[in-house]
């Protein structure tokens, strides 16, 4: 029977009182716990720990603690460490890998063999992330965010990118001695200072300013051609130790926090990138567009790997070309409208200079303030339609029919410029306008003159354009159409000189003596002309205006021009068909347009109806080609802007060439060939989904494995330029982090400077850098406190600015201002700015103090 708890507690108290005596000896059984006191060497058996209930044990422990505290000998307490040592006295070691891992196939990295590496073993060789060099022209814009460069002239250098470092070297004279009249853009004094920079350093600023005042201006830097650039770059890469020396080093920059982009606000030079490195900002001009695109990729790689991983930002590349709205139809109408307006303006100005009719100046002058845009647009559309109408009619008629038509019009064509301009073709009108431009004159100034067929045709067009200086009013045009001047009257003999009655009741703005003097001047300039394909064996002479009414000289000249153009276009079309259809052994002889049309016409149809049908056929073909061009998805994607047209090459006349080929009249096989070619072009330009309907049933080769469509060079250049971000000179750098070269600490572990015989730290490849934040008035030192806050704020501001300025947010607006960000540098002949200071202090560049 178990004793109650109160009895057990009383027994424990009795034992404690008995053990307090120093002479008593205590013995404990095996099931008792022995605790040693630190005050004396006697063993005190406090309590026999038997199997008691949980509440009994806790009560006994409390009693023991209170008794020990009240005792004078300060008995030892129950300590956990002693208990753990009593329970597990031996040290515990981790188990072996064999016991823990029963699967022998799984192997853990056990670094048991820590033998030192031999001294002969070398680390792997260093390979830069990117290394390339080329020839460029450099123009320094800013020495610091607060200081504009005084010397803004172009200078030629060798640029080298070595992973995260950008170096500029002077070009050795042996590399450019084959280039005639070469100039590096460096003054003679700068060259002497560079040569003697190892011995003499001009640290006095006053001496430098005095020297700059008496420096003669130098010539502008020569522009490298693509062949010269490739040849010199190859020689430098082959012998870098000779040309890329420390003495030839101009400046060295780090790519940490560097920026670059297309300077859309700079239009004087082509193939230019604006770059900001350390504290300076400069322009880089490349020799050709391929070099510019490649170096934009090299700079992006170097900037991305320049910073450490913990401070490196996520790259924000523009890997997809910027989206453009498809406005081909609208821009096509604008282009034709502007071209027509310019043509109308040139004709009206020539009329004002020659005839001085004040009643038509106010009516047809494009510069008049009374004419609004709607009237000009309607007038230009009428003018374009008249050109196409008369051009198609002139090609379809024989020379005799054209003579009859011009004679039937009579006096109505003498007083009209709009009616006479209808005899000009669209191709000849555009070429005559282009020939009068300044660029065309400069291009053909040094070209040797030859007596070829092209030169004769050009002189013929120029004579016709000089003669064609008469304007017809709208009332005269309506009266002329009502009188049927374009259609010959039946029964008129061909081989005789035609006399036409003057139409009555016509409002004439020029008196009869003036008209006769004008006609006499025109007839004197016209020479006897014989039509090339005329069936009549007589030549048309310019009769005297005294004997009888003569045929208008403008009509004769323009009809002969149409005949020559018809022969030229027919020969071009025949050559094209011969090249495309080599399998045809025998080709039918090209026939005349009138003979071919007469053969196609049914019985009972007149020649006038044939000309009408041919004219409608020509206009229909032109409309079909315009619709085909508008429906093409490849060419409709982007439009010609200033940047893309200049960099993409001279491929802007493809549509006009195709349309001119379509107007050439020849044999029946020519039409079938042109139709087949148009169908092939339309299928090739359409999308893959639209071509599924043309694939026969059961054919899986084309449907599931379509042919790879190679991208054209023009589209490659256009998309590459769109992927480069713009960089304006007014881009605010406030709050951005820049690095400035400073003198580093003198530690034994610091890398030694390779070439220390220079005062400027930017002229040393190995220099220390220190981060600063661009403040409103001065630079702020970058430390750990403001680094994260400023960098995070700057990044948010950049993201916000890009979201506001980008046009790709999904808004489908119709303004064309969003395309201006991608416009690159337009080609211009200006070499430099108007600044005359050509000297630059090489020793003071890069020394910026906060």
Swiss-Prot record:
Residue segments, region Disordered: 324-348, 406-428, 451-494, 583-659, 793-850
Subcellular location: Cytoplasm
Ranges of Basic residues composition bias in the record: 324-338
Domain of life: Eukaryota
Domain PH: 194-306
Keywords from the named record: Cytoplasm
GO-annotated cellular components: cytoplasm; cytosol
Composition bias type Polar residues, residue spans: 417-428, 605-619
Record flagged with keyword Kinase: no
Major subcellular location class: cytoplasm
Composition bias, Low complexity: 406-416
Biased composition (Acidic residues): 626-658, 799-850
Biased composition (Basic and acidic residues): 479-489
InterPro entries in alphabetical order: PH-like_dom_sf
Xref: PANTHER family: PH DOMAIN-CONTAINING PROTEIN YHR131C
Additional detail: Present with 172 molecules/cell in log phase SD medium.
Listed name of the protein: PH domain-containing protein YHR131C
Organism: Saccharomyces cerevisiae (strain ATCC 204508 / S288c) (Baker's yeast)
